[in-house]
Amino acid sequence: MLNLKLRNEFLGSQMPGTAITLRRKDNTGAAQRGPNSILSITYPTADVQTALRAVSTDRSKRPIVLMGDRGRGKSHIMAVMHHAVESSSQVQKWANEWGNRLGAPPLSGLVLDGGFFAISEPVHNHEYPLLWDLIFERHPKGDFFRGKFNQMGRPYPPRSLLEEMFETQPVALILDEFQKWFDGLSDQPGPEGINTGHWPRTSSRIYLSFPRTDRTF
């Protein structure tokens, strides 16, 4: 007998939804709750281990892309990565304990990289038409740098401004359903309109690689 038991949320009269969403209006998204809420329903699969290594001190220092069909657990993994950034000590402890339990040295010896601020958003909800709107709103110093950008009178924030902002507080930007969001972009009309359908393709690395001295994520 395995002595398996259903979790409490499955013992009620109504079955709850099982889809993982990073953020919700009622603040019940996986990125808005404590790390234990997602860790308690997570098994360290090969994909989860790969994702955790990507945010560890041994990471390859390049943007990370999760690809797969709907329902393959990408949002779940992103939620784990969010908390690996925001609550690195708790997630590292969870991973190390699983590593000892499974006899898996990559997990038992995992050391997560701290010091980053996670900005996670399911962008296909179109709450933010431009990525810098999201970054300025969520970054701890976002209001200050948004003011500097507005004073410039430019259609795009320059790279130097973004790098200055990320030097003050390094950021890990986690975007769910990015491709769906990108495919829905359209250019603004007129010669002064922002070419929203073009800038992410040419500048995505600026927004996905944030420097802190010689380190990028």
Question: Where are the regions a protein language model picked out?
Answer:
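Flexible phosphate/Mg2+-sensing switch loops adjacent to catalytic phosphate-binding sites
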Residues: H82-F117, F144-Y156, I194-H198
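Conserved P-loop NTPase "ATPase switch" module shared by AAA+ and STAND
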Residues: M165-G197
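Short glycine-rich substrate-engagement loop in P-loop NTPases that contacts/grips substrate
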Residues: E127-L162
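Residue-level preference for the first positions of well-ordered beta-strands
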Residues: K61-V65, A118, P170-A172
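Substrate-engagement module of ASCE P-loop NTPases
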Residues: R159-E167, G193-F217
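Phosphate-handling catalytic cores of nucleic-acid transaction enzymes
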Residues: D26-N27, S60, S89-N100, P189, ...
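Walker A/P-loop-proximal flanking segment of P-loop NTPase domains
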Residues: M1-R72, A79, V85
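A short hydrophobic beta-strand->loop->alpha-helix junction that borders the nucleotide-binding pocket
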Residues: F117-E127
